[in-house]
């Protein structure tokens, strides 16, 4: 008798509070955005971060520290300001990897639990992920300017040196901006596709 009464109460509850059906459009958009974020992180890890025509070298994440040591070991010019810029660059890249991990984790939680709050938080994080490679562009260009200033005493020997030939952003930064930009846009669009209510049933 109690089971029958409980069953009737449950039916009344579900009649008043109809279930919601998952938005598959939002699910697919979130999944694609998550993959793009992972691709951006992989590109920043594997592809060249910047190139130096003057040193005839392309530098990826693994070669970053060795590149800094090469410049620090030479005694011809003072590159302390340039090394500070590279340290700032490395810190931003590490933050980028952390935010990508947070973004991917939130995306997985969104795919599983499908909560609007998770979508909003993930969109905010995705904006931070997008902002970092854009900032890296300015850091790399500023570092190139610092290095060009340090090389001014040697211009009589090597001639005029353009900052872009000393240091220029490469594939990893460009790819990260493209991938994270598209991902942030997809996360934004997914916010407009909410769960739909299923017709009331007894």
PLM region spans:
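Alpha-helical transmembrane segments and their immediate interhelical/interface regions
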Residues: 2-29, 79-112, 174
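Cytosolic juxtamembrane helix and N-cap/initiation of the first transmembrane helix
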Residues: 2-59, 187-202
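Hydrophobic transmembrane signal anchors and adjacent membrane-proximal interface regions, especially
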Residues: 20, 50-52, 69, 97, ...
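Signature of small four-pass
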Residues: 26-41, 92-140, 187-194
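Long, glycine/tryptophan/cysteine-rich extracytoplasmic
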Residues: 40-91, 143-171
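Alpha-helical transmembrane segments of multi-pass integral membrane proteins
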Residues: 130-202
